[in-house]
């Protein structure tokens, strides 16, 4: 089972809000997930970003692969792989 850390889109049309989730790579974007580790709201300047650093580090050490966007968000939050 390949585990990814990725974004789940919520919110309204043209007003997105995202949750950072840990999910099987084969599950749909807004489908089943294993764990929720944070939120990301790009509608503010600067953007609102909340990440549970302990949970993120735990999943990264267990082999979960972040997507490109989530990797950039981790860098913004100061979380290393």
Curated annotation (Swiss-Prot):
Q: Which domain of life is it from?
A: Bacteria
User: Keywords of this protein's UniProt record, alphabetized?
Assistant: Ribonucleoprotein, Ribosomal protein
One Pfam family named in its UniProt record: Ribosomal_S16
**Family per record:** Belongs to the bacterial ribosomal protein bS16 family.
Q: Which PANTHER family match?
A: 30S RIBOSOMAL PROTEIN S16, SMALL RIBOSOMAL SUBUNIT PROTEIN BS16M
Q: Which HAMAP family match?
A: Ribosomal_bS16
- Report what the protein is called: Small ribosomal subunit protein bS16
Protein encoded by which gene: rpsP
């Amino acid at each position: 089972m390949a585990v990814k850390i990725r974004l789940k889109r919520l919110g309204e049309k043209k007003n997105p809000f995202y949750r950072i989730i840990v999910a099987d790579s084969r599950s749909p974007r807004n489908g089943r997930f294993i764990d929720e580790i944070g939120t990301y709201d790009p509608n503010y300047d600067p953007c609102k970003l909340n990440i549970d650093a302990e949970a993120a580090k735990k999943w990264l050490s267990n082999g979960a692969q972040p997507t490109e966007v989530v990797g950039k968000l981790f860098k913004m939050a100061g979380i290393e792989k």
